[in-house]
Amino acid sequence: RIILTADYLKKGFFFFLTIIMFGFVNNLYAQQDTIFFHSKPSDTITSDSAVIQFLSDADIPVTTDNKIHLLKSGKEKFDDLFSTIKKAKHHIHLEYFNFRNDSIANELFTLLAHKAQEGVEIRALFDAFGNWSNSRPLKKKHLKNLRKKGIEIYHFDPLRFPYINHVFHRDHRKIVVIDGTIAYVGGMNIADYYIKGLPEIGEWRDMHVRIEGKATHYLQEIFLSIWNKTTKQNISGTAYFPIYSDTTFHKGKSIAIVDRTPKKTPKQIRQT
């Protein structure tokens, strides 16, 4: 979910984008992990703003000088996302509740396979329950074929008997991070009905956000935390967290990212 709030300051308006991530198994984060990234002290915002004070008290990170572009439809999202993927040089990370096995997913996977051939690292993660509950799920044969093409793809928290394990703690995140510099987050999974709509409801209305700037590092850290726990890998390092100068997006937007960690941060989610 995305919450846009504005807080008035003496010298003008100060905008915040608060991104709320839901999902995960009960004890996935029994201990806090650090991937290889923490913002410099200069990222701390000093203000008498009630919003900023709350975020600080709740230990919710806020970064400055970000560029934000609101994507108000499925077509806008996928056009923008695919265009950025084509320009990727080092890595593409995707985390979704589900990848519906339809035309838009096929287009995405074809593009990702092409980038893998160019040497770009491709990592994709989806929720096992989200895939199982999908009317057009990815099957083992699909995953095997994607891996042959150089796409690392795994499902989070596989379903086990009696098939309701952690049913209320699923991974509902929708995150894409490209080269550690551009990120996408919002309400849309990978499915063609975000563009075509559905017969029973008509046009599908949802939104997504493209982010450039230091906030992408937090989304990268969130992705790599669950990726490393799921795959037992240890992906980290400066290649995934490129350094931004303090003037990259001068006078850009400030972004607060709230990540739901079960048994650790549910209070943050409720209050935010």
What residue spans do the PLM features occupy?
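Charged, low-complexity intrinsically disordered terminal segments
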Residues: 28-272
